[in-house]
Amino acid sequence: MQNLLLPFLFLPLLGFTQTNLPGILNIQERAAVIDEILEDRIDNLLPVLMRRTGIDMWVMISREYNEDPVMKTMLPSTWLSARRRTMMVFYDPGEGKELEKIAIARYSVGRLLEGSWDINAYPDQWEALINVIAEKNPNQIGINVSENFALADGLVKTEHEAFLKVLPEKFHPRIVSAEKLAISWLETRSEKELEIYPMICRIGHAILQEGLSEKMIHPGITTTDDVVWWLRNRVNELGLDTWFHPTVSIQRADPESFDHLRTFSKRPDTRYIQFGDLLHVDFGITYLRLNTDQQQHFYVLKPGEKEVPQELQVAFNKSSRLQDILTEQFALSRSGNIVLKRALDQAKSEGLIASIYTHPIGFHGHAAGPTIGLWDQQGGVPGRGDYPLYHNTAYSIELNTSSEIPSWGKVIRIMLEEDGVYTKDGFWYLDGRQEEIFTIPRH
């Protein structure tokens, strides 16, 4: 098969920095890349995951506009939703044999799943599904039901009940939750995805560099909401999507203290940007079915200032150190809760006032995989935090530290978030990370 990802492979050789916007594919080109990646994932990744989790048959059932989140990631680029009732069956006949991909539908699902419903032989769709199950006689039939992971709980009550009603009793003991398989499918990035993910993160960084600059921000005139909507409009102009509404907030030398609850549960108030403000932005895009989630800081230079005040940069460096502390704790099979505890213990030993709330990222912004803290659950997250780390999962390294700023007479928080991936070679940032506070204007 022609490798449609080659144009991306040469981009790192061009000497891009975070200020350069990579070329963005048109819709037809995107569709070709999406389908190439999807075919590769199903043919090469899915069999490995099914064997790892011990499920030899995976059944997914969804109706149009009410799709299972997992099924939605398996639809080809030209399918924007399921059709009527779509049934997907993946069957692993064993080592050395090719994965069987079956659609119990009137038509094939693109080139990926062959339609196998002979309406003359089986007028009822459910009967056709049961025939496939009886013919393959699997040891375990995985269905997407999960108490802890919403993304792995996509089999709705109506379809679940209908399935069990028609399934012969002898197969009922073989029904198992496909939670681990669903999470593995969603969280694991393929080699092809890891080839393009750095460029997707680069696009997000480049948009931030453009929007939080003297081009857009004029102290005393521009509001935080102006910047937010500039970001939304710019994403739209580029033909991209955003999976959440951005935020831009301000910390400055005034009596107002940092409101932890407001920061995480409410949108910041609209404020005019002034000289000497420390701006924080939270922003993410969706492109080629992958998401980004980035938080960075920008300082608006006062007239005559040439650089960021040292005390602010020192505060920033503490959060950078916390990033390192956290990612140094990543280890295969270690749970998110253990990673969280070890990182917070190390941060405390170094005198950092730290908070960690890191999450996987990929097909979804807050994606499947181990949760490493929530902003309001620093003691661990039951269920999602107990899930172990595997290789080739991408993470948004999201956290903050608190620091006293003597000249401001107050405590500030430096909240950072950058996307990276944990592989057998360790953790690395997909497009680097912010290493110092950016100035407005740039120097």
Q: Model segments located where?
A:
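Sec-dependent N-terminal signal peptides
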Residues: L4-L14
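Active-site neighborhoods and metal-handling regions in enzymes and metal-associated proteins
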Residues: T19-H443
